[in-house]
Amino acid sequence: MAMFPPVEDSVLQNNPDFVNLYNKLTNVVLNSDCSTQNGPRAKERASVRQELDRRRLISAKQHLLTCAISSATPSSTPPATRASSRLQPPKGHQAGGSNSQQQQPSLPEPLLDLLIVLPPLLDANNPPLPQDTLQLLFAHPPLSELETLLPALAPIIASNLRTWALGLARIAHPSTNASFLHRHIASLPTTLSGWRSDLAAAETELSSHRLRSLAALTSLLQAATNALSLLIRALEVKHGKVARSLELRAAEASLHARRYDADAVIAAASVRRAFYTPEAITALRNYGAHLRDAKMRSEERVRGLAAELGEYGVGVDGGENKEKKMREMSRVYREMTRQMDDTRRDLDRLNQG
C-alpha cells in the first residue's frame, strides 16, 4: 500500500506556506494511502474495498478448509473423542499394544477411505484430473457418500483448525499457560489487526526518524563545514603574511622565468637573422633548386642507363644468354683493344729506333 511521503523538518521550518499546504493535503484532502478522502468516486472505492474484503474473507475460509481437509489423516480424532479416550483407565500391562488399540475409537471404513482419497484431490501441487476421471470417482464410494460422511468428517476438520489456532495463540501469547491458550482463539483476528496497525505506525515512525536523522546529519555536516571555514580563517590570520610573501615571491619568480624565456626567443631570432643574411638565404634557395634539378637529371640518367642495359639483356627476365654473349663480346673487345695498344706501342718504338 502506498504511503504519503514524509517531508523533512527543515523544509517545513523554512517554508511556512508549504506547511499549511502539506497539513491540508495529509489531513483533509488525502488519506494515508494517497487516495482522496472526499472525491467523487470515494463511495465507489469504499464499496469496492468492502467487496474485496468480503471476497478475501471467503477465499481465506475456503483456503483454511481446503488445507484442513488436505492435512486430515485417519489418525486425526476430534478433541472430545481424545478426551474420552484419556478418561478410560488402563486394562493392565499384560494386554500391551492390543489393549491400547482397542481403547482408541476406530473410524468407519468409508470415512477412512474418504480421508485417504480427499487430500490428493485437494492438493494444488498435483495436476488436475480429467473430467471423466472425476465423474467416475464421484459416482462411486466414498466420494458418492460425501454428504453422508460430512457430519463425521467435520470433527476431524475442526480438530485441525483448532490445532492451528492454538499454534497461532501460542505465538501471540507466548507467556500464557498452554491450558488457557484456547481462551485467546476468539481474539486472534483483533490481535493480528492490532499488530498490523502497530507495524504500519512503526514503519511511519521509522520513516520520520530517518528523516530526522538525515536532517541532524545535514546540520552536523554544516557545522563541520563552518568549523573548517573558521579554522582556515584562523590559519590565514596567523600565517597570512608569510603565505602572501611566499605567493608574491613565487609570482616574481614566474615573471622572471617568463622574461628570460622571451629574451631567449628574441636572442635566437637575432642570431638567426645575423647568420642567415638575405644573400645567404637566396644562395641556399638557389643551391636547393640546383640540387633538386641535379637529382632529377640523375634519376633520368639512371633510367636511361637501365633501358640501355635492358637492351643488352641485363636486368631483364629471359635475357641471361644475351647478357652472357654481350659480356663475352665486351671481354673480347677489351682484349683486342689491349693488343692493339701493345702493337701501337711496339710500332712507336720501332719508328723511334
Curated annotation (Swiss-Prot):
The keyword Coiled coil applies. The keyword Coiled coil applies. Keywords: Coiled coil. It comes from the Eukaryota. Residues 69-106 are annotated as: Disordered. Residues 70-86 have a biased composition (Low complexity). Residues 319-353 form a coiled coil. This is Uncharacterized protein FGSG_10745. The lineage of its organism: Eukaryota, Fungi, Dikarya, Ascomycota, Pezizomycotina.
